Amino acid sequence: MPSYTVTVATGSQWFAGTDDYIYLSLIGSAGCSEKHLLDKAFYNDFERGGRDSYDVTVDEELGEIYLVKIEKRKYRLHDDWYLKYITLKTPHDYIEFPCYRWITGEGEIVLRDGCAKLARDDQIHILKQHRRKELETRQKQYRWMEWNPGFPLSIDAKCHKDLPRDIQFDSEKGVDFVLNYSKAMENLFINRFMHMFQSSWHDFADFEKIFVKISNTISERVKNHWQEDLMFGYQFLNGCNPVLIKRCTELPKKLPVTTEMVECSLERQLSLEQEVQEGNIFIVDYELLDGIDANKTDPCTHQFLAAPICLLYKNLANKIVPIAIQLNQTPGEKNPIFLPTDSKYDWLLAKIWVRSSDFHIHQTITHLLRTHLVSEVFGIAMYRQLPAVHPLFKLLVAHVRFTIAINTKAREQLNCEYGLFDKANATGGGGHVQMVQRAVQDLTYSSLCFPEAIKARGMDNTEDIPYYFYRDDGLLVWEAIQSFTTEVVSIYYEDDQVVEEDQELQDFVKDVYVYGMRGRKASGFPKSIKSREKLSEYLTVVIFTASAQHAAVNFGQYDWCSWIPNAPPTMRAPPPTAKGVVTIEQIVDTLPDRGRSCWHLGAVWALSQFQENELFLGMYPEEHFIEKPVKEAMIRFRKNLEAIVSVIAERNKNKKLPYYYLSPDRIPNSVAI
């Protein structure tokens, strides 16, 4: 009678173990075994983090083992069990069966061996059937739903507990936004201010009451230099929203600025038009905010938005500085162009309005839409169309870890009606919905391809714009990811025809296009992929967006937004319509009140924290791949990333403002916060 040694590994996360009865059946080319109870007398099996081995003897020869079936049956109380993997030592072989899934209730799961296979590689009926059934089950579990009209579709789940267990957080308490924000304010010693809505600060120094306990190197420098034009300009390159600035190739008619207005700022004895031709003028246009409804959820506090246009100049030191700001889109007598030569407080308030507008675009478009929602689309499509045995599922699953869960929690607590977002933000109460609906029309595939996005904004010349660290580091990380995906693609797809004939891949890409991009041709998202090169690029987009791009725009929020005047989440007075009337008192009364300041500070602190046991780029502790060539590619990937870490660390030495958001040792694998 054939005998097998079965080793079962239980996950190490909280509540991963089980006391339920676990049964195993083996399915082979010559037949199926009876189910065997995996149990040792006087031994606590399947404990959290444990590895348990069992000898299983079957009555008849099973032939080549294709599948392992695991069944969980109730002992006393039901407890979920997280199965990492099973290994099987046969008389002639050693087989690994990756799982990395939860088995809930009186559930069962059927596992294939860990060798990645395309659908064309499965010639055995039972394996084809298993592949088809897995996708049929997943497509019932992972359903598309419209969160808001015009948005990319999301997961069909009203709350976190409605999600499939495999994509829920290990501990829901750890991602409770209400609890985390309250904890943040308690830890930051600012909870005494959190209910003081409508109560203004006295002056800029008064903001230090909620700042001094929590400052760090960058936030301290922001506090000390936020009023300076150099600091203002620097943030467009290396702050937490470094994706808006672009080279100005033609002065827009809606910004009627002249050489005479800005000649004091121009250092090359050239006219403004000549500076434009020389490539020294840059622009940031917040047109998307024009006409967006401001938050009206608090009848006691009027809140306001603007849609500024900011003109910037590259001076002789190659630094970017502002030279003209118009606070709304339509030029006119009541919409003056503010200049550095205006009174101190006129110019300062104009810059504050730009910073506030930048905050809104950053939170809702750069961060929410272009990383969170896009990554959720990739994740849902992956689960619906790629079986666990598919090499691209094995590649991508680490990069959508907890993404659907964090977005569901955000819809449940943060971005919902009367949620936390409404408490402090001028775009709460529905404005953020309008913003996403507009921005989706400009969401393109090429804008997610990092090198193309940089080039499209005219920001690709490293000698011409030498201090754009977001660009420099991003390109290094992009190239490392693309090199890795190219290797993986070449292992499983020997030529372009194999790519084109992989129907599961094509269904994945089509799902993203149809449901994520709502079938919008102008998005430029492919409906199909027909070459290895394009597949590598597509996979790079998925991984880069979920990891590097999210890290670049998320984890600097506390650094750049904790000093409230530098990133006001709301403004309590409308933009000035004339020059020479702004006072310091007016600025302070325009800035957020104490309560909203505290909620904002708690938010940017909580959102800037890494998860406990964070997995950073290149870390793949779940061994979905078992083949040697892919494992070797992973090792090379990690070495490339380590080299980038060293390059960035060397550049940052002795810098007063180090840029480290795209250092791979600070880039989580996925959008999970």
From Swiss-Prot:
PROSITE patterns (UniProt xref): LIPOXYGENASE_1 (PS00711), LIPOXYGENASE_2 (PS00081), LIPOXYGENASE_3 (PS51393), PLAT (PS50095)
Topology versus the membrane: Peripheral membrane protein
Co-factor binding comment: Binds 1 Fe cation per subunit.
Binding site for Ca(2+) 2: 18-19, 44-45, 47
EC number: 1.13.11.-, 1.13.11.34
Record carries keyword Kinase: no
Residue numbers binding Fe cation: 367, 372, 550, 554, 673
PTM (free text): Serine phosphorylation by MAPKAPK2 is stimulated by arachidonic acid. Phosphorylation on Ser-523 by PKA has an inhibitory effect. Phosphorylation on Ser-271 prevents export from the nucleus. Phosphorylation at Ser-523 is stimulated by 8-bromo-3',5'-cyclic AMP or prostaglandin E2.
Positions contributing to Ca(2+) 1 binding: 17, 79-80
Catalytic activity: (5Z,8Z,11Z,14Z)-eicosatetraenoate + O2 = leukotriene A4 + H2O; 18-HEPE + O2 = (5S)-hydroperoxy-18-hydroxy-(7E,9E,11Z,14Z,16E)-eicosapentaenoate; (18R)-hydroxy-(5Z,8Z,11Z,14Z,16E)-eicosapentaenoate + O2 = (5S)-hydroperoxy-(18R)-hydroxy-(6E,8Z,11Z,14Z,16E)-eicosapentaenoate; (18S)-hydroxy-(5Z,8Z,11Z,14Z,16E)-eicosapentaenoate + O2 = (5S)-hydroperoxy-(18S)-hydroxy-(6E,8Z,11Z,14Z,16E)-eicosapentaenoate
GO BP: arachidonate metabolic process; dendritic cell migration; glucose homeostasis; humoral immune response; inflammatory response; leukocyte chemotaxis involved in inflammatory response; leukocyte migration involved in inflammatory response; leukotriene A4 biosynthetic process
First-tier enzyme category under EC: oxidoreductase
Residues annotated as site: Essential for stabilizing binding to COTL1: 103
Source organism, top-level taxon: Eukaryota
Record-listed Phosphoserine modification sites: 271, 523
GO CC terms in record: cytoplasm; cytosol; dendrite; nuclear envelope; nuclear envelope lumen; nuclear matrix; nuclear membrane; nucleus
Function: Catalyzes the oxygenation of arachidonate to 5-hydroperoxyeicosatetraenoate (5-HPETE) followed by the dehydration to 5,6- epoxyeicosatetraenoate (Leukotriene A4/LTA4), the first two steps in the biosynthesis of leukotrienes, which are potent mediators of inflammation. Also catalyzes the oxygenation of arachidonate into 8-hydroperoxyicosatetraenoate (8-HPETE) and 12-hydroperoxyicosatetraenoate (12-HPETE). Displays lipoxin synthase activity being able to convert (15S)-HETE into a conjugate tetraene.
UniProt protein name: Polyunsaturated fatty acid 5-lipoxygenase
Species classification: Eukaryota, Metazoa, Chordata, Craniata, Vertebrata
Gene assigned in the entry: Alox5
